[in-house]
Amino acid sequence: MDKLRRELAPISQEAWNEIDAMARETLKASLSGRKIVDVHGPRGFDYAGVPLGRLSVPKQQPSGEVRYGLHQVLPLVETRVDFSLDIWELDNIGRGARDPDLDALVEACRKIAAFEEKAVFDGFKAGSFIGLHEYAKDRKVGAVLNSDAFLDAVAEGQAMMRRDGVDAPANLVVSVDIWKFLGKSVPGGTLRSIVERQIGGRVVYSEAVKDAMLVSARGGDAELTVGQDLAIGYNGHDTTKVSLYLLESFAFRVITPQA
């Protein structure tokens, strides 16, 4: 038996397939951070920390010839969201239902995705994660919803990165308002397509940013390390409901703040 205990749930394989497909679809739409940073893993459920390649050497040490240092690691945070589904409704999948009520699953996916997104963009103090916004707060370029002014702001952002030694393609992470604005048609295509040609990367929609953020696409500048990737496990059940949970473990760090 594995740690997820899925084989104990009163759920058919057909229903599990539907549950997993819905979870993948929801998470893919909700996890923007994974589209713009390096993702390492999954390393496994027992992977607990990312080695940082440094020693912390205490100043106060016992007298004698032997001294010691402690390896620095970035611990992974493990997140979990519980939810319940109706057993009869899951059985309906086997009866041919094509619109099963999986709203509780969708909500759980959005909650756990929001936690990861917040950790990537805003940081997670308890885990010593510093988010992308923290590094970008002193390197802002004003942008308004005007085609020429917006393209100029993107160009200024690129110039700022080059002055900091980051001469590489970039991705632009944008809020919902800017995402809609970039969909407008202009000579040469949509404004989004013009921006993508300009930056050499992608425009990525995210609910975790308020305006827009330019992030290097060369790789090696920020990383999300995954231990246990997002997975659904079984808690228990009664005659009407099956209790499940969504689980993951991860750590995030920025390696090159200028990017």
Predicted regions and their residues:
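Extended, solvent-exposed, turn-rich assembly/linker loops in the middle of proteins
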Residues: 132-195
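Structural beta-strand/beta-sheet cores of well-ordered domains, especially the beta-sheet scaffolds
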Residues: 81, 168-170, 240-242
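Sequence/fold signature of self-assembling virion shell proteins
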Residues: 2, 40, 185-259
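Alpha-helical scaffold segments that mediate packing/assembly in large oligomeric complexes
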Residues: 84-87, 91-156
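N-terminal "assembly arms/tails" that initiate or stabilize quaternary assembly
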Residues: 1-70, 227-229, 233-243
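Long, hydrophobic/aromatic-enriched structural stretches that serve as scaffold segments
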Residues: 50-99
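A generic local secondary-structure boundary/capping motif
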Residues: 72, 160-163, 233-234
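Long, hydrophobic, amphipathic alpha-helical segments used as structural scaffolds
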Residues: 34, 38, 116-123, 162-165
